[in-house]
Amino acid sequence: HVNQGLSNDHLNANWYICFKHKFAKNQRVKKMLRFDQLSYWERAQYLSNHTFGIVGAGLVGMSTALSLRERFPTEKIMILERGYLPTGASTKNAGFACFGSPTELKDDLENMSEARVWETVALRLEGLELLQKRVRADQMDYKNCGSWDLIGQNEAKLEPDFVAYLNREMKQNFGLGDVYSIDNNFQQTFGFEGYQAAYFNAYEGSIDTGQLIKALYKQCIAADIHFLFATEVQHWSSNAQNVEVHTQHGALVVQQLFLCTNGFAQAFFPTELRPARAQVLLTKPLAHHIKGTFHSDRGYYYFRDIG
Protein backbone atom coordinates (compact mmCIF):
# COMPACT_ATOMS: atom_id res chain seq x y z
CA HIS A 1 0.00 0.00 0.00
CA VAL A 2 1.45 3.40 -0.97
CA ASN A 3 0.66 6.37 1.24
CA GLN A 4 -0.62 9.11 -1.07
CA GLY A 5 -1.58 11.67 1.53
CA LEU A 6 -3.99 9.34 3.32
CA SER A 7 -4.41 9.56 7.07
CA ASN A 8 -3.17 6.86 9.41
CA ASP A 9 -6.76 5.99 10.25
CA HIS A 10 -7.49 5.51 6.57
CA LEU A 11 -4.38 3.36 6.18
CA ASN A 12 -5.27 1.26 9.20
CA ALA A 13 -8.78 0.75 7.86
CA ASN A 14 -7.40 -0.40 4.51
CA TRP A 15 -4.96 -2.78 6.16
CA TYR A 16 -7.74 -4.12 8.37
CA ILE A 17 -9.98 -4.74 5.36
CA CYS A 18 -7.15 -6.49 3.48
CA PHE A 19 -6.25 -8.60 6.50
CA LYS A 20 -9.85 -9.52 7.21
CA HIS A 21 -10.42 -10.46 3.57
CA LYS A 22 -7.26 -12.61 3.51
CA PHE A 23 -8.21 -14.28 6.78
CA ALA A 24 -11.66 -15.12 5.45
CA LYS A 25 -10.13 -16.62 2.31
CA ASN A 26 -7.79 -18.75 4.41
CA GLN A 27 -10.71 -19.94 6.50
CA ARG A 28 -12.52 -21.08 3.38
CA VAL A 29 -9.43 -22.95 2.17
CA LYS A 30 -9.08 -24.83 5.46
CA LYS A 31 -12.62 -26.19 5.25
CA MET A 32 -12.36 -29.09 2.83
CA LEU A 33 -15.35 -30.27 0.86
CA ARG A 34 -17.04 -33.48 1.86
CA PHE A 35 -17.22 -36.26 -0.71
CA ASP A 36 -20.93 -35.65 -1.27
CA GLN A 37 -20.17 -32.00 -2.15
CA LEU A 38 -17.78 -32.85 -4.97
CA SER A 39 -18.72 -32.46 -8.62
CA TYR A 40 -19.80 -35.33 -10.82
CA TRP A 41 -16.41 -35.29 -12.56
CA GLU A 42 -14.48 -35.31 -9.28
CA ARG A 43 -16.49 -38.19 -7.87
CA ALA A 44 -16.21 -40.16 -11.11
CA GLN A 45 -12.42 -39.81 -11.32
CA TYR A 46 -11.34 -39.94 -7.69
CA LEU A 47 -13.99 -41.80 -5.70
CA SER A 48 -15.97 -44.18 -7.91
CA ASN A 49 -15.47 -47.75 -9.11
CA HIS A 50 -12.20 -48.49 -7.34
CA THR A 51 -11.34 -52.16 -7.13
CA PHE A 52 -8.60 -51.76 -4.54
CA GLY A 53 -8.28 -49.31 -1.65
CA ILE A 54 -5.06 -49.06 0.34
CA VAL A 55 -4.76 -47.34 3.72
CA GLY A 56 -1.32 -45.78 4.18
CA ALA A 57 0.98 -44.16 1.62
CA GLY A 58 4.23 -45.39 3.13
CA LEU A 59 6.69 -47.96 1.83
CA VAL A 60 4.29 -50.85 2.40
CA GLY A 61 1.25 -49.04 1.01
CA MET A 62 2.87 -47.85 -2.21
CA SER A 63 4.71 -51.14 -2.73
CA THR A 64 1.39 -52.96 -2.33
CA ALA A 65 -0.22 -50.64 -4.88
CA LEU A 66 2.55 -51.22 -7.41
CA SER A 67 2.39 -55.00 -6.93
CA LEU A 68 -1.37 -54.88 -7.49
CA ARG A 69 -0.87 -52.82 -10.63
CA GLU A 70 1.53 -55.46 -11.98
CA ARG A 71 -1.13 -58.14 -11.48
CA PHE A 72 -4.15 -56.04 -12.46
CA PRO A 73 -3.14 -53.55 -15.19
CA THR A 74 -6.60 -52.02 -15.72
CA GLU A 75 -8.20 -51.98 -12.27
CA LYS A 76 -8.64 -48.71 -10.37
CA ILE A 77 -6.38 -48.44 -7.31
CA MET A 78 -6.59 -45.76 -4.63
CA ILE A 79 -4.30 -44.98 -1.68
CA LEU A 80 -5.72 -43.10 1.32
CA GLU A 81 -3.20 -41.28 3.52
CA ARG A 82 -4.13 -39.37 6.66
CA GLY A 83 -1.31 -36.82 6.34
CA TYR A 84 -0.34 -34.38 3.64
CA LEU A 85 2.83 -36.50 3.54
CA PRO A 86 3.20 -40.14 4.62
CA THR A 87 2.95 -39.75 8.40
CA GLY A 88 4.22 -43.12 9.63
CA ALA A 89 7.71 -44.50 10.04
CA SER A 90 8.50 -44.75 6.33
CA THR A 91 10.24 -41.37 6.18
CA LYS A 92 11.40 -41.41 9.80
CA ASN A 93 13.45 -44.59 9.86
CA ALA A 94 17.23 -44.67 9.63
CA GLY A 95 17.37 -46.09 6.11
CA PHE A 96 19.10 -49.41 6.75
CA ALA A 97 19.08 -52.09 4.04
CA CYS A 98 19.58 -54.87 6.58
CA PHE A 99 18.54 -58.45 7.23
CA GLY A 100 20.16 -59.37 10.55
CA SER A 101 23.21 -58.46 12.59
CA PRO A 102 24.96 -61.42 14.25
CA THR A 103 24.00 -60.45 17.81
CA GLU A 104 20.41 -59.85 16.69
CA LEU A 105 20.28 -63.30 15.11
CA LYS A 106 21.80 -64.83 18.25
CA ASP A 107 19.10 -63.18 20.34
CA ASP A 108 16.41 -64.39 17.93
CA LEU A 109 17.73 -67.95 18.01
CA GLU A 110 17.52 -67.89 21.80
CA ASN A 111 13.88 -66.76 21.74
CA MET A 112 12.29 -68.49 18.75
CA SER A 113 12.74 -71.59 16.63
CA GLU A 114 15.66 -71.89 14.25
CA ALA A 115 13.30 -72.41 11.32
CA ARG A 116 11.40 -69.21 12.09
CA VAL A 117 14.61 -67.19 12.38
CA TRP A 118 15.83 -68.21 8.93
CA GLU A 119 12.36 -67.79 7.44
CA THR A 120 12.43 -64.19 8.70
CA VAL A 121 15.88 -63.60 7.20
CA ALA A 122 14.61 -65.04 3.91
CA LEU A 123 11.68 -62.59 3.87
CA ARG A 124 14.02 -59.67 4.57
CA LEU A 125 16.37 -60.65 1.76
CA GLU A 126 13.46 -61.21 -0.60
CA GLY A 127 12.09 -57.77 0.24
CA LEU A 128 15.44 -56.08 -0.36
CA GLU A 129 15.83 -57.90 -3.68
CA LEU A 130 12.34 -56.83 -4.79
CA LEU A 131 13.03 -53.25 -3.74
CA GLN A 132 16.26 -53.12 -5.74
CA LYS A 133 14.44 -54.48 -8.80
CA ARG A 134 11.70 -51.87 -8.43
CA VAL A 135 13.83 -48.82 -7.61
CA ARG A 136 17.26 -48.10 -9.11
CA ALA A 137 20.14 -47.63 -6.70
CA ASP A 138 20.63 -43.98 -7.66
CA GLN A 139 16.92 -43.23 -7.12
CA MET A 140 17.16 -44.15 -3.43
CA ASP A 141 20.85 -43.37 -2.89
CA TYR A 142 21.56 -47.01 -2.09
CA LYS A 143 25.11 -47.62 -0.84
CA ASN A 144 26.48 -51.13 -0.44
CA CYS A 145 28.65 -49.97 2.44
CA GLY A 146 28.28 -53.01 4.68
CA SER A 147 27.47 -52.81 8.38
CA TRP A 148 29.20 -53.29 11.71
CA ASP A 149 27.77 -54.97 14.80
CA LEU A 150 29.51 -53.36 17.79
CA ILE A 151 30.17 -55.26 21.03
CA GLY A 152 30.31 -53.18 24.22
CA GLN A 153 32.93 -53.56 26.93
CA ASN A 154 30.46 -55.33 29.22
CA GLU A 155 29.08 -57.65 26.54
CA ALA A 156 30.33 -61.09 25.62
CA LYS A 157 32.00 -61.56 22.27
CA LEU A 158 30.51 -64.06 19.88
CA GLU A 159 32.06 -67.50 19.75
CA PRO A 160 33.96 -68.17 16.49
CA ASP A 161 31.89 -71.34 16.04
CA PHE A 162 28.67 -69.27 16.12
CA VAL A 163 29.94 -66.86 13.46
CA ALA A 164 30.93 -69.89 11.36
CA TYR A 165 27.42 -71.31 11.86
CA LEU A 166 25.83 -68.06 10.62
CA ASN A 167 28.05 -68.03 7.54
CA ARG A 168 27.27 -71.66 6.83
CA GLU A 169 23.51 -71.06 7.04
CA MET A 170 23.71 -67.94 4.87
CA LYS A 171 25.63 -69.89 2.23
CA GLN A 172 23.39 -72.96 2.29
CA ASN A 173 20.08 -71.08 2.43
CA PHE A 174 20.79 -68.01 0.30
CA GLY A 175 24.02 -68.59 -1.59
CA LEU A 176 25.81 -65.72 0.18
CA GLY A 177 29.42 -66.44 1.07
CA ASP A 178 31.48 -64.98 3.93
CA VAL A 179 28.70 -62.69 5.15
CA TYR A 180 30.00 -62.16 8.70
CA SER A 181 33.58 -61.58 9.82
CA ILE A 182 35.32 -60.00 12.79
CA ASP A 183 36.87 -56.59 12.07
CA ASN A 184 40.05 -56.25 14.10
CA ASN A 185 40.75 -52.74 12.78
CA PHE A 186 37.44 -51.03 13.55
CA GLN A 187 38.85 -48.90 16.39
CA GLN A 188 41.63 -47.51 14.19
CA THR A 189 39.16 -46.96 11.34
CA PHE A 190 36.36 -45.27 13.28
CA GLY A 191 37.88 -44.17 16.58
CA PHE A 192 34.98 -45.52 18.64
CA GLU A 193 35.33 -45.75 22.41
CA GLY A 194 33.49 -48.17 24.65
CA TYR A 195 33.50 -51.09 22.23
CA GLN A 196 35.76 -54.12 22.39
CA ALA A 197 34.87 -55.86 19.12
CA ALA A 198 32.99 -55.44 15.86
CA TYR A 199 31.56 -57.92 13.37
CA PHE A 200 31.30 -56.85 9.74
CA ASN A 201 28.39 -57.77 7.44
CA ALA A 202 29.48 -57.45 3.82
CA TYR A 203 25.97 -57.47 2.31
CA GLU A 204 24.08 -54.75 4.17
CA GLY A 205 23.86 -51.11 3.14
CA SER A 206 22.09 -47.77 3.48
CA ILE A 207 19.16 -46.06 1.75
CA ASP A 208 17.84 -42.50 1.65
CA THR A 209 14.22 -43.24 2.55
CA GLY A 210 13.10 -39.76 1.52
CA GLN A 211 14.37 -40.38 -2.01
CA LEU A 212 12.88 -43.89 -1.92
CA ILE A 213 9.41 -42.60 -1.01
CA LYS A 214 9.67 -40.01 -3.79
CA ALA A 215 10.65 -42.69 -6.33
CA LEU A 216 7.77 -44.96 -5.32
CA TYR A 217 5.32 -42.05 -5.46
CA LYS A 218 6.42 -41.17 -8.99
CA GLN A 219 6.02 -44.80 -10.03
CA CYS A 220 2.52 -44.88 -8.56
CA ILE A 221 1.50 -41.74 -10.43
CA ALA A 222 2.93 -43.16 -13.67
CA ALA A 223 0.97 -46.37 -13.01
CA ASP A 224 -2.32 -44.42 -12.72
CA ILE A 225 -2.69 -45.06 -8.99
CA HIS A 226 -4.82 -42.40 -7.26
CA PHE A 227 -3.94 -40.72 -3.95
CA LEU A 228 -6.21 -39.07 -1.41
CA PHE A 229 -3.93 -37.24 1.02
CA ALA A 230 -5.19 -35.64 4.27
CA THR A 231 -7.85 -38.36 4.37
CA GLU A 232 -7.99 -40.36 7.59
CA VAL A 233 -9.79 -43.69 7.60
CA GLN A 234 -11.87 -43.81 10.77
CA HIS A 235 -13.53 -47.20 10.36
CA TRP A 236 -14.73 -49.61 7.71
CA SER A 237 -17.41 -52.24 7.19
CA SER A 238 -17.66 -55.02 4.63
CA ASN A 239 -20.13 -57.39 3.02
CA ALA A 240 -19.86 -60.06 0.34
CA GLN A 241 -19.55 -57.50 -2.47
CA ASN A 242 -17.47 -54.57 -1.22
CA VAL A 243 -15.98 -52.56 1.62
CA GLU A 244 -17.36 -49.23 2.79
CA VAL A 245 -14.57 -46.96 4.02
CA HIS A 246 -15.50 -44.08 6.33
CA THR A 247 -13.28 -40.99 6.53
CA GLN A 248 -13.63 -37.48 7.96
CA HIS A 249 -14.74 -36.36 4.48
CA GLY A 250 -17.42 -39.02 4.09
CA ALA A 251 -17.65 -42.62 2.91
CA LEU A 252 -16.44 -44.33 -0.24
CA VAL A 253 -16.66 -47.88 -1.54
CA VAL A 254 -13.96 -50.27 -2.78
CA GLN A 255 -14.09 -53.96 -3.58
CA GLN A 256 -11.06 -54.86 -1.47
CA LEU A 257 -9.26 -52.93 1.26
CA PHE A 258 -5.59 -53.29 2.25
CA LEU A 259 -4.51 -51.93 5.64
CA CYS A 260 -0.85 -50.92 5.29
CA THR A 261 -0.41 -48.79 8.39
CA ASN A 262 1.82 -51.23 10.32
CA GLY A 263 2.14 -49.84 13.86
CA PHE A 264 -1.08 -47.85 13.51
CA ALA A 265 -3.08 -50.96 12.56
CA GLN A 266 -4.33 -51.24 16.15
CA ALA A 267 -6.94 -48.63 15.19
CA PHE A 268 -8.56 -51.24 12.94
CA PHE A 269 -7.90 -54.56 14.66
CA PRO A 270 -9.02 -55.60 18.17
CA THR A 271 -5.58 -57.00 18.99
CA GLU A 272 -2.75 -56.26 21.39
CA LEU A 273 -0.72 -54.53 18.70
CA ARG A 274 1.23 -51.61 20.10
CA PRO A 275 3.98 -49.75 18.23
CA ALA A 276 7.24 -49.49 20.15
CA ARG A 277 8.37 -45.99 20.96
CA ALA A 278 11.54 -44.98 19.15
CA GLN A 279 13.71 -41.89 19.28
CA VAL A 280 15.94 -40.43 16.59
CA LEU A 281 18.89 -38.20 17.46
CA LEU A 282 20.55 -36.07 14.78
CA THR A 283 24.01 -34.67 15.52
CA LYS A 284 25.69 -31.57 14.22
CA PRO A 285 28.40 -32.24 11.59
CA LEU A 286 31.18 -34.34 13.12
CA ALA A 287 34.84 -33.46 12.71
CA HIS A 288 35.70 -37.13 12.16
CA HIS A 289 33.26 -38.16 9.44
CA ILE A 290 32.07 -41.73 9.95
CA LYS A 291 30.80 -43.63 6.93
CA GLY A 292 28.75 -46.79 7.23
CA THR A 293 25.87 -48.37 9.13
CA PHE A 294 26.30 -49.62 12.68
CA HIS A 295 24.31 -51.77 15.12
CA SER A 296 24.71 -52.45 18.83
CA ASP A 297 22.88 -54.24 21.65
CA ARG A 298 21.31 -56.97 19.48
CA GLY A 299 20.19 -54.46 16.88
CA TYR A 300 18.09 -52.34 19.26
CA TYR A 301 20.42 -49.37 18.77
CA TYR A 302 21.83 -48.28 15.45
CA PHE A 303 23.39 -45.27 13.77
CA ARG A 304 24.75 -44.19 10.40
CA ASP A 305 26.14 -41.21 8.51
CA ILE A 306 23.91 -38.89 6.50
CA GLY A 307 24.59 -36.00 4.15
Q: What function would you assign to each model-found segment?
A:
Residues 50-78:
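N-terminal Rossmann-like FAD-binding beta1-loop-alpha1 element of flavoenzymes
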Residues 71-92:
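Glycine-rich FAD pyrophosphate-binding loop
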Residues 198-240, 246-248:
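Helical element adjacent to the flavin cofactor pocket in flavoenzyme catalytic cores
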Residues 48-50, 247-256:
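Core beta-strand elements of the Rossmann-like FAD/NAD(P) dinucleotide-binding domain
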Residues 82, 138-144, 251-252, 256-307:
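Active-site substrate-recognition segment that forms the wall
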Residues 88, 92-122:
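Glycine-rich active-site loop/strand segments that organize a redox cofactor
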Residues 5, 10-52, 70-71:
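Extreme N-terminal leader/targeting segments of oxidoreductases
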Residues 103-109, 133-218:
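Flavin (FAD/FMN) cofactor-binding and adjacent substrate-gating region
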